[in-house]
Swiss-Prot record:
Residues 780-794, 877-894 have a biased composition (Basic and acidic residues). It is found in: Cytoplasm. Key component of the ribosome quality control complex (RQC), a ribosome-associated complex that mediates the extraction of incompletely synthesized nascent chains from stalled ribosomes as well as their ubiquitin-mediated proteasomal degradation. Thereby, frees 60S subunit ribosomes from the stalled translation complex and prevents the accumulation of nascent polypeptide chains that are potentially toxic for the cell. Changing K549A: Reduced ability to mediate CAT tailing. Its main location: cytoplasm. Changing R88S: No effect on protein abundance. Decreased CAT tail synthesis. No effect on ribosome-associated ubiquitin-dependent protein catabolic process. One of its GO terms (molecular function) is alpha-aminoacyl-tRNA binding. This is Ribosome quality control complex subunit 2. GO terms for biological process: CAT tailing; peptide biosynthetic process; rescue of stalled ribosome; ribosome-associated ubiquitin-dependent protein catabolic process. The modification Phosphoserine is found at S797. Residues 714-761 have a biased composition (Acidic residues). Residues 350-383, 713-768, 830-912 form a coiled coil. The gene is RQC2. Residues 459-499, 708-824, 877-898 are annotated as: Disordered.
Length: 1038
């Protein structure tokens, strides 16, 4: 089975992935269950979502099927998420003439390198191509964290990869002649002859190991692939077979076929060019027949097992047409790989079960054969003992003679060894009695072994039986040939001679007569027959137990949870909310959060729709796209949802909801026209409320079936774009929340830093000052020097008489600004200058005159000697940072204000999302009819009256059971209901429905339940008790 993509496959896949993925954002990265080398990359952008499967070193492709994901990611995936999550894929390119794919994120800030040669690797690089993380460490290449990755450079993305295009174009224009092919083969022949000469010289010199060396000649397939490596190995092999050339044949044998080889290469090159340039993409899958397939038992999809995939039509020999088939897949080549691997993974479980069943059947057959062998052994023992008993009776006189002869020697008190030597001597002399005895004698147990020939009576009996059978055969088949008759007579004569020569050893007890010895054998036969009956009886029970045990093991393995690949279905827009479809076909929605409530109102609610609420501040919406009167049953069902989703469920309060038309609802405050908080609405006219009777808190859980309808496959949901816009808005809101949290953290850090600095300055001041008087003097001296410094920078106009007050103020401001620009002036003094303090200007003039001759160097030296220069620099740096942070906060504030204005526009716009509600009604069915093609199963949590037409439903009421336990019990109940194998009775469950229910997991259904603490009521069973076991009876009264 093909597991690794070839160089041609990667070239085609890279082009498709570049076209499909560039511009998408990587939303998340996951491990795929049962493999640490497989990864799932999820990309999205406002109008679509794409999933990419990466198997390290083996394959990469877009998939339309879901993959099982482990609960916790690996360390490598955590590293990838940290750097690549939410980054945009800006470029995707393949390294020239190499099986390396490079994904560029965030305009070159990060690179994800996928290697598909050898064992493969996945490497994360930073903007300088420095390795940040590796999927596996390869010592041969010395790729380590912190080193520069050298398999590509910046030119791969900066030069638009012109070199790669040039090499591809060069390969595309290549032409091959018979002279060129002849040169290749001649070069191989010359190397072969030189190697032969070297080996002969080694043989002449008598060096060891020379005879063991063999000169290998490359096959024609290997030679062509080494000369034209850009052509795929599979493509060359296919075309060699088309030209009736064995790919494994030696290239030296085709020295006279250079013309056909050149034609083969040119046709292969032409096919290669067509694969790269064609826009009509197709893929092909070669499947082979499953040897374990049983048509009466297995499903049709197990008849053939996928073996290989190619971008070209594979070649099948004429004799393999029955055992192989070619499946053509229309569309991009990614779709071919997705179908190939997804089908293999989906059928892997079924094939495993099929293999386990065959192994179980083999175990049963082996056990049955072992039991048959035991019974046959008992039958053989009975037959042998019966024959021995009859032989002893027939040869009773002979047996007595042998007994008397041996007994006479024993009576003479001869040594047992001497007796055996005497018998051996008599056997050589031809003594008839001695020849019947088997040595050694078992005199210790007073027994001897005697060899008896089959009696003439038994021979006559067997011959009579043969004659009778021959006579019967002749009567029944009078047309038989005379030659067959003669051959059967010859066979019977040979068998009689063989039987006459056959001897049987019989054990004789010297203490018993011949007939008594025969009785012993008949007793053994009787005991064996009784044992046979017991064995046969026990065998029947044992076989039944073995079959039951194996059947239980198979059922247990079938019940074990296994991951089933499901095609990713685009969810309906209302599936992200709490929803149900009423018994009259009206869509009822409720947001799971205040933000979702606002989304429903702004995106989908129109004036003729219904708004429903209650005293617990729950909000439910009823869509009325046809603008008809909403039936009372729908209002009642929506009221049940409204009350059940509130605190009334946990408190078990039966209250009355109320409703009004959506045109009576506003999102703006009536006084200042500002937007109300999330999830809050205002009624324009309080008198338009319509109260309903108290709602019963009875919900239910059931299944809807999405079936294929006309145009179902071609037309997607009309609201996908709206959904993506909502997701973008949610992402923006999350970003704003994160920014606000970051601002709070920064402010807290600044306050802590400021406090620490103030504390450290106070401590330093106490340490340096010595006492309070000295510190006061130093501070006053420092202050005077700074004032003198400032005076130097101040420029006072000499024409004081002509200056007006405004001019003076202006001059003061300009001078102050110039002082502020100097790096060495404290900001606190500058701010004090601007304050109108009496006598300040005169003091500044004196300072300016006093330090008029002081240059910049002397001033800085004085400040450094005083120790105030560093403090001034820190203060200025802090001021700059505060200004920058203030600007960032202003930008964020403006962004949030802009978002609020957009939100206000969202609530005021009249255009709503366009949704085909009739299409949804036709696709979703509460029960299946014969002939329906099911796309998917959709679980629903809805009021019980809305589920009365559903085939699969259970009642849920307030209780104390947990959600997961309740869902487990519900799914177990649905799976254990009886089935209608023919799928004709609409009232009974169908196998197809149970197969889809088995794919559901409790964890995926928990979010559907908008209530907590449940009590489930299942038909024909006792309802789940509140809080587990009932309380024990109270103690007896004293």
């Amino acid at each position: 089975m093909k597991q690794r993509i070839s160089a041609l496959d990667l070239l085609l896949l890279a082009r498709e992935l570049k076209q499909d993925l560039e511009g998408y954002r990587l939303s998340n990265i996951y491990n795929i269950a049962d493999s640490s080398k497989q990864f799932l990359l999820k990309f999205n952008k406002p109008d679509s979502k794409l999933n990419v499967v990466v198997d390290c070193g083996l394959r990469i492709y877009l998939t339309e099927f879901s993959r099982p994901i482990p609960p916790t990611p690996s360390g490598f995936v955590v590293k990838l998420r940290k750097h690549l999550k939410a980054k945009r894929l800006t470029a995707l390119k393949q390294v020239d003439q190499d099986r390396i794919l490079v994904l560029q994120f965030a305009d070159g800030h990060f690179y994800l390198v996928l290697e598909f040669f050898s064992a493969g690797n996945v490497i994360l690089l930073d903007e300088n191509r420095r390795i940040m993380a590796l999927q596996r460490v390869v010592l041969e290449h010395e790729n380590k964290v912190g080193q520069i990755y050298e398999m590509f450079d910046e030119s791969l993305f900066t030069t638009n990869n012109e070199s790669a295009d040039e090499s591809i174009e060069k390969n595309r224009k290549a032409e091959y002649t018979s002279e060129l092919v002849n040169e290749w083969i001649k070069a191989v022949q010359a190397k072969y002859e030189s190697d032969i000469t070297v080996i002969k010289q080694l043989n002449i010199q008598g060096k060891e190991g020379a005879k063991k060396k063999k000169v290998k000649v490359p096959s024609i397939h290997k030679l062509l692939l080494s000369k034209v490596p850009h052509l795929s190995s599979d493509l060359l092999s296919k075309n060699l077979k088309v030209f009736n050339i064995d790919p494994s044949e030696s290239c030296l044998n085709l020295l006279e076929e250079t013309d056909s080889l050149a034609e083969l290469l040119n046709s292969t090159q032409l096919e290669y060019n067509q694969l790269l340039t064609t826009t009509d993409r197709k893929g092909y899958i070669l499947a082979k027949r499953n040897e374990n397939y049983i048509s009466e038992k297995d499903t049709a999809d197990l008849e053939f097992i996928y073996d290989t995939f190619h971008p070209f039509k594979p070649y099948i020999n004429g004799g393999d047409t029955d055992s192989s088939c070619i499946i053509e897949v229309e569309g991009p080549y990614n779709r071919t790989l997705d179908k190939f691997f997804s089908t293999i993974e989906s059928s892997k479980y079924a094939l495993r079960i099929q293999n386990q069943e065959s192994q179980a059947q083999k175990k049963i057959d082996d056990a049955r054969a072992e039991n048959d062998r035991k019974i046959q052994a008992l039958l053989d023992v009975q037959e042998l003992n019966e024959r021995k008993g009859h032989l002893i009776i027939e040869n009773a006189p002979l047996i007595e003679e042998v007994k008397l002869a041996v007994q006479g020697l024993i009576d003479q008190q001869m040594d047992w060894n001497t007796i055996e030597k005497l018998i051996k001597s008599e056997q050589k002399k031809g003594n008839r009695i001695a020849q019947l005895l088997n040595l050694p004698l078992n005199l210790k147990q007073n027994k001897i072994s005697v060899k008896l020939d089959l009696s003439s009576k038994e021979l006559n009996t067997s011959s009579d039986e043969d004659n009778e059978s021959e006579g019967n055969t002749t009567d029944s088949s009078s047309d038989s040939d005379s030659e067959d008759m003669e051959s059967s007579k010859e066979r019977s004569t040979k068998s009689m001679k063989r039987k006459s020569n056959e001897k049987i050893n019989v054990t004789i007890d010297l203490g018993l007569s011949a007939y008594a010895n025969a009785t012993e054998y008949f007793n053994i036969k009787k005991t064996s027959a009784q044992k046979q009956k017991k064995v046969e009886k026990n065998v029947g029970k044992a076989m039944k137990n073995i079959e039951v045990k194996i059947d239980q093991q198979l059922k247990k393995k079938l019940k074990d949870s296994h991951s089933v690949l499901k095609k990713i279905r685009t969810p309906y827009f209302f599936e992200k909310y709490s929803w149900f479809i009423s018994s009259e076909g009206f869509l009822v929605m409720m947001g799971k959060s205040p933000a979702e409530t606002d989304q429903i109102y702004s995106k989908y609610i129109e004036d003729d729709d219904i708004y429903m609420s209650n005293s617990f501040n729950s909000h439910v919406w009823i869509k009325n796209p046809e603008k008809t009167e909403v039936p009372p049953n729908t209002l009642m069902q929506a009221g049940i949802l409204c009350m059940s989703s509130s605190e009334a469920w946990s408190k078990k309060i039966s209250s009355s909801p109320w409703w009004c038309f959506a045109k009576n609802v506003s999102k703006f405050d009536g006084s200042d026209n500002s937007i109300l908080p999330e999830g809050a609405f205002r009624l324009k006219n309080e008198n338009d409320q319509n109260h309903l009777p108290p709602a019963q808190l009875v919900m239910g859980f059931g299944f809807l079936w999405k079936v294929k309808t006309s145009g179902n496959e071609d037309n997607g949901d009309d609201d996908e774009e709206e959904e993506e816009e909502e997701e973008e808005e949610e992402e923006e809101e999350e970003e704003e929340e994160e920014e606000e949290e970051e601002e709070k953290e920064e402010e807290e850090k600044e306050e802590e830093q400021q406090q620490d600095e103030d504390d450290s300055n106070e401590v330093n001041g106490l340490e340096k000052g010595g006492d309070s008087n000295d510190s006061t003097k130093n501070n006053s001296f420092e202050h005077d020097n700074l004032e003198k410094d400032i005076e130097k920078h101040c420029t006072i106009s000499s024409d004081t008489d002509s200056d007006s007050g405004n001019a003076k103020a202006k001059n003061d401001n300009s001078s102050t600004q110039r002082i502020l620009d100097e790096p060495g002036v404290p900001i606190s003094l500058i701010e004090n200058i601007n304050s109108n303090v009496r006598g300040k200007r005169g003091k500044l003039k004196k300072i300016q005159k006093k330090y008029a001759d002081q240059d910049e160097t002397e001033r800085l030296l004085r400040l450094e000697a005083l120790g105030t220069l560093k403090g001034i620099e820190k203060q200025q740096q802090r001021k700059k940072e505060e200004i920058m942070k203030r600007e960032v906060r202003e930008d964020r504030k403006n962004k949030r204000e802009k978002q609020r204005r957009l939100q206000a526009l969202k609530f005021t716009k009249k255009e709503k999302a366009r949704v085909n509600y009739d299409k949804h009604k036709s696709e979703l069915k509460p029960s299946l009819d014969k002939g329906d093609v099911v796309d998917d199963i959709i679980p629903v949590f809805a009021p019980w009256p809305a589920l009365l037409k559903y085939k699969y439903k259970v009642k849920i009421q307030p209780g104390s059971a947990k959600k997961t336990k309740t869902l487990t019990e519900i799914l177990h109940y649905f799976k254990s209901r009886p089935l209608d194998g023919s799928s004709t009775d609409n009232e009974m469950d169908w196998p197809q429905e149970h197969e889809m229910i088995k794919g559901l997991k409790e964890q995926d259904l928990v979010l559907l339940l908008c209530v907590d603490k449940l009590k489930v009521t299942i038909a024909g069973q006792k309802s789940t008790k509140n809080g587990g076991n009932s309380s024990k009876k109270g103690k007896k009264k004293r």
